């Protein structure tokens, strides 16, 4: 028996207990301070006096505020040699990572910059993952003007959330970086490195991360990371690799000066090899007061590779002429194999565990539990699928603006063109067993499908802006735009079981899946008219917009009116059905009012109102059934109406004295003719038929939010932050019909999110305690459905202690609780404990050795629970469990001395 992991566990436990019992001693870090208006500190020279051998220095603050900018001091946050920027976000009041995305005061951060330029344009996560904390001087968070407003000098009140990372000037002109090599138990490894050099007008950053510890992000076809990807532990067993390069160069002139030229870009290769296992349980509530239960068990294995390159060229040709060009290219290769077992029951189970699915798999012929007092099995499905998809994507963006006069008459052009080509080959082998029907069913016992799909998507848009200064206004802007969207896909689909032989037997073809017939003419015999499809979607738009922009004494107002002429056409040729060629001419209208009032004393107020109309996609009006999934038939509706939306929001934010930050917002949305689905479930066959319909009387939503953070002492040794989000939605929904047609009922949805956290620096201690609660409930006007609710609570505790001899001990304990009213939660309690010990060596502490222990209690998974209008859900995904890893971390610099 290998006792090495157990000995490591014991050692870490003893050290953790020691750190909890050690006596805290407060000390002051001697260093420079940052002058701030809000704290009214005196200049450094006045605060630091020469007292012979002794020097008195003020305490380093975690952050200071300058008007609407918050500046976080990285050296005051207690970073270790191995910490990256993302590891320090939780210690910065006002910043948080939520669902993998970075937020500032409750708003999503759209740009992460390094010394004022984007680290990687369009991606806010690369800098968080790859910038080591020790080379960072400070981090600035603020709301900024858009690039277009900066160039034109016309501010319409739009702002974007920006995080600007300022590097330490002592590394100016030198190469700095770090290398982290780690290997551990259970064959876990993590290798990552970063190298960076920068001057006043250039920067080059090279990075690479390679790991199988489950730290990854998922990406879109365009090569961009999904907002919910996130760094951290993913589900399943994942190998993740991400080498890349980011750079910037300008000719030394200041932005806005004649002749200014800058080029910045990035490129890289990303790989994700993923092996996952998950279980899901869904209960649907029917109109007769009963329910159906669906259980799924799935294993997947996939590989994803992304090659990407981005470039941006900026040129201020003259003081009146500006040009920006941004090309992009990416290629995404995705291969997937999955195995799924799924069953449905008419009714529910007392414990709602997964034992009924396991038992049914052991008795697939007779079915179990069948005709029991609790539930009746109606369908068992076994599925094996393969997919091989490649996608090329290229995009070109051009922006040109020309000032025409001294009083800023201006003509601008913005053009964007994008093209995507995709090619996918897919095999899908499904076997169905039905228990409740004795008559012929529309669901066949076996589906052995093969399809080849080629798609071409083309987007082209041009906008011309004319800005005219008018007395009393900053600008009157007229905009004409034209847009073309064209999507064409051709899918050739086949039912291989129609060829007989091994193709018509699930168990015989399972080891051969992906193998195609070799005899001539098999395509004609096996052709599948339900999935063979030639689809062309075309949309042409001409838009006319005018803006009245006013700005004076901190008040900015933008009133806009937009009218768009739209022509939509769909060519829908499906199998043996008659071709459909629907088209539509329509007009869409949008009215917008955006106001912003900024003051230095009482903060910033914002108000916006927007009204707009939108058409349902023509594809939703197609009445031919979508039978890609035999158990779920989808129908369109040619009578769908135009949607109308009213949206208003009010916001306020202020940076107060002594580092306090406060922001709040209220949004109200009303929409009419919202598109939803009306469903009918057949208890005998297990088939659900859905149809798209408009909801009458509309629905509305009210969502307030509040964010507050404050130091609890003058030295900012202890900081508190909190956020509250609430959402109230009131509207109508359809029951799931089974004994009769689905009926409308009123429903009210409440969702509450509360977060509070305390971070403290007490001498050699760095402590953090965060708690997040989320509660959701749905109340219904019908007696058929009970009210449902779900609850989630996550408590996160972090501790860091610096021992003698440059040794640092860290521990993180996260405890989660999940609850679903009347429903089963797979793992209602989960506690994850991570810990590490880091020892620095050499005179400059450039070498460190870290012993990391992950998931000491071996409870990591991804448990999810939720409620919806007509259902509740519980899910579980496997994760990387307990491992111990030894790291060697070396940081280097070519700077002498």
For the regions a protein language model found, what residue spans apply to each?
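Bacterial N-terminal signal peptides that target proteins for export
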Residues: 1-10
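Bacterial N-terminal signal peptides
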Residues: 10-19
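Sec/Tat signal peptide C-region and signal peptidase I cleavage site
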Residues: 20-24
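Short, acidic, small-residue-rich periplasmic hinge/interaction motif at the N-terminus
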Residues: 26-78, 97-99, 105-109, 143, ...
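Start-of-domain marker
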Residues: 65-70, 80-82, 87-90, 150-151, ...
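Short, polar/charged loop or turn motifs at beta-strand boundaries
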Residues: 69-87, 114-119, 180-185, 251
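Periplasmic plug
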Residues: 101-149, 162-169, 202
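Primarily recognizes Gram-negative and organellar outer-membrane beta-barrels
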Residues: 122-125, 145-187, 202-656, 660-897
